[in-house]
Regions:
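Helix-rich, typically C-terminal accessory recognition domains appended to large enzymatic cores
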Residues: 295-338, 346, 350-351, 357-384, ...
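Short helix/loop capping segments that flank catalytic or ligand/cofactor-binding pockets
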Residues: 10-11, 41, 48-51, 139-141, ...
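Conserved beta-strand -> loop -> alpha-helix junction used to position metal-binding or nucleic-acid-contacting
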Residues: 195, 203-241
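Conserved small/polar residues in nucleotide/adenosyl-binding loops
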Residues: 392-394
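Basic, short loop/linker segments at the boundary and entry of helix-turn-helix/winged-helix-like folds
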Residues: 2-78, 90-99, 106
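Gly/Pro-rich turn-and-neighbor structural signature
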Residues: 83-181, 186, 266-326, 330
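Short amphipathic alpha-helical "interface-anchor" segments enriched in bulky aromatics
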Residues: 196, 200, 211, 215-219, ...
């Protein structure tokens, strides 16, 4: 038994908190008023309703800006297809069909987001540096018409551009004409790409190659020639003495590695474009010129159809474009910037697999453009989508 005199009441309270995740329905209440009531208590005038000033995001729909933003975030960022979102919402007591979700997202992209998307496309064409890439996408409506492979094209602004954005555009194929349609036929800036011929058709623009692509092709050949089996530098040197082809590939990779190490140091030292230009002229130009001389002298050591032969030929064919970055401190040595921006689409494609319709693919291109641009600017993606949908639909 505890005596009451032994109990001391502590005046300071211990507070604890928990975060609770919950769904809710925001209801609007409309007040009704009568203008006049007679002596018998009857309404003489008709009922007057207070105006409901809230404008629906989609007429006749319960969808709000945050709901559509959440659906888009789950699909395009988290990689959750609509059928799985439908299952999860049903489990939580919110039965919404995937058809409704799809309709909401497409309506919002067409009615509210597309004008913003078109402005972004216009703005990115004013950038001095752009990066381009393309990747396949399956569109069932196109497949039924046998149009061949369908493509999602990507255009993103250069590292030093004031406006940081990524623009996705769907097109039924990879035809050269669409590159001009997307970028603008009169574009006169710098186009970073992977060697695709479509980007060489611009009379006023300067194409820049991708050293990372060249390195990858050489490394694939290097791996075939026992590269993956060699454990240390000593083994490598011994193997190279007795395998001339391997030694050639190893030398090429070493030279390219040096170039990338220089670029990494410039980033680490936070150099300005002007300083980068000077450093490249002093540290890289002679080495890169020497590398192309080496490629030319040793290309006959490989058959044209071998991986090594194709890799070396790629480098020689791309020589001018691969060297162009030396002439501009804002240019990049590779097109990795575009590849990083297109990767979220590639990863998402593994989850949702295909688009049913052309309009669905075009809608996806709009959402991906806004989402990846938000990422590039350090924004909260879901909050950003909610904000612009709330703002634009008013």
């Amino acid at each position: 038994m505890v005596s009451g005199s032994c109990i001391n009441v502590l005046k300071k309270e211990d507070l604890s908190g928990r975060k609770v995740l919950t769904d809710y329905v925001l209801k609007s209440v409309t007040d009704n008023y009568s203008e006049e009531i007679n002596e018998d208590g009857e309404i003489k005038a008709k009922i007057v309703s207070a105006p409901n000033t809230e404008k629906r995001l989609i007429k006749g729909s319960l969808a709000s800006a945050s709901v559509v933003a959440g659906l888009a975030f789950n699909k395009f960022v988290s990689g959750t297809p609509l059928y799985r979102q439908e299952q999860e919402l049903k489990r939580r007591g919110v039965p919404i069909s995937r058809a409704s979700m799809s309709n909401w997202m497409m309506r919002c992209s067409d009615d509210y987001l597309k004008p913003l998307y078109e402005l972004m496309k216009k703005d990115i064409r004013s950038c001095e540096h752009i990066h381009m890439d393309e990747t396949t996408v399956t569109v069932l409506e196109e497949k039924a018409e046998r149009t061949g492979k369908n493509y999602m094209w990507l255009m993103c602004s250069g590292k030093w551009e004031e406006q940081q954005m990524a623009i996705y555009c769907y097109h039924k194929n990879r035809e050269h004409a669409f590159a001009k349609e997307m970028i603008g036929e009169d574009y006169s800036g710098k186009i970073h790409c992977d060697g695709y011929e479509a980007y060489e058709k611009f009379e006023k623009a300067t194409p820049l190659g991708c050293m990372a692509h060249f390195r990858r092709y050489v490394y694939e050949a290097y791996e075939l020639d026992a590269g993956s089996k060699i454990k240390n530098r000593t083994e490598l040197q011994e193997y190279a003495k007795t395998h001339e082809a391997f030694g050639i590939l190893n030398h090429i990779l070493s030279e390219v590695k040096y170039l990338f190490e220089c670029e990494s140091k410039y980033i680490k030292d936070k150099l300005t474009p002007e300083e980068i230009y000077t450093k490249r002229q002093d540290e890289q130009k002679e080495r890169l010129e020497g590398l192309f001389v080496y490629l030319d002298e040793h290309q006959t050591h490989f058959t044209k159809q071998s991986k090594a032969g194709k890799a070396i030929q790629y480098g020689l064919n791309q020589k001018e474009k691969l060297m162009n970055y030396l002439n501009d401190g804002e240019a990049e040595i590779s097109n990795n910037r575009a590849e990083r921006s297109v990767k979220p689409f590639v990863m998402g494609r593994k989850a949702w697999l295909f688009s049913n319709t052309i309009s669905g693919a075009e809608s996806s291109s709009i959402y991906y453009s806004l989402i990846e641009s938000a990422k590039m600017n350090g924004l909260d993606i879901e909050a950003y989508l909610t904000y612009i949908l709330s703002l634009i639909h008013i």
